[in-house]
């Protein structure tokens, strides 16, 4: 979903003639993220120069960033999350990548998915970086603002994406248990399959029964160049509706398996 939502914005901001070098966390999420971004950027006309896997929790990414300098790429895509993203982005900036001009283009770094907490960890390095996120406290819909108000009253600061996700998931689980009339996992699963809801801050949302994928609106964001506080780190560039990021359930294949084992 990150690729589908981010692709048009990358085309608008950086153009169609780009060469991308991917550094990808070597596990399922990283592989999927890389595949999504490659699919949509290559459809724009971007060339994928290289796609290099990095160990989860590598810490020091210098041996992976150094080859980027001589690769001919003018975009570095960091398919990393959490501390890996903070470390790889920080080190890429320290290597001076954002100061370079390659192929007549100013070098760019893209982080397909990140949160405000990750942005805090990256500090000034996140400024101007494009990516996507699941939710942001600055959204103006009624559900988001109600949560922001109550969270702020309790904790004295705006909620993070992680806080909103945990809150929503807890409500959804409680509702599924109530609907199923039991805590027995197979019945709770059935209550969630195909469940549609709204008002939580992510637009009209559905847990698709066929593959258990949660489809919702996606936010394209950019690191704020002039934040007013430690919580004002992301600018919302575009709210991409769920309809633009959905894909057929057969695309990735596989079976979910039986309800009971």
Which residues are covered by each model-predicted region?
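Extracellular/periplasmic Venus flytrap/periplasmic-binding protein
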Residues: 1-95, 137-146
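Venus flytrap/periplasmic-binding-protein-like
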Residues: 56-57, 98-124, 189-197
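Extracellular/periplasmic ligand-binding modules, especially the Venus flytrap/periplasmic-binding
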Residues: 82, 137-195
């Amino acid at each position: 979903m990150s690729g589908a939502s981010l692709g048009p914005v990358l085309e608008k901001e950086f153009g169609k003639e780009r060469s991308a070098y991917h550094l990808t966390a070597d596990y399922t999420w990283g592989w999927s993220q890389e595949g999504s971004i490659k699919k949509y950027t290559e459809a724009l006309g971007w060339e994928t120069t290289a796609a290099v896997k990095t160990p989860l929790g590598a810490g020091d990414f210098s041996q992976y960033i150094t080859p980027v300098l001589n690769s001919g790429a003018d975009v570095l895509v960091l398919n990393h999350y959490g501390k890996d993203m903070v470390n790889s982005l920080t080190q890429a900036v320290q290597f001076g990548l954002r100061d370079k001009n390659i192929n007549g283009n100013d070098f760019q770094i893209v982080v397909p998915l990140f949160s405000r907490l990750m942005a805090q960890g990256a500090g000034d390095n996140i400024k101007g970086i494009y990516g996507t996120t699941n939710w942001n406290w600055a959204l103006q819909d009624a559900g988001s603002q109600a949560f922001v108000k109550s969270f702020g009253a309790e904790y004295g600061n705006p909620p993070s994406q992680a806080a909103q996700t945990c809150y929503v998931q807890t409500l959804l689980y409680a509702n599924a248990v109530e609907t199923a009339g039991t805590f027995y996992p197979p019945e709770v699963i059935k209550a969630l399959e195909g469940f549609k809801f709204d008002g939580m801050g992510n637009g009209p949302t559905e847990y698709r029964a066929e593959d258990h994928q949660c489809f919702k609106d996606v936010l394209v964001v950019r690191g704020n160049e002039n934040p007013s506080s430690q919580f004002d780190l992301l600018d919302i560039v575009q709210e991409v509706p769920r309809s633009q990021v959905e894909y057929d359930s057969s695309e990735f294949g596989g079976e979910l398996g039986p309800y009971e084992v």
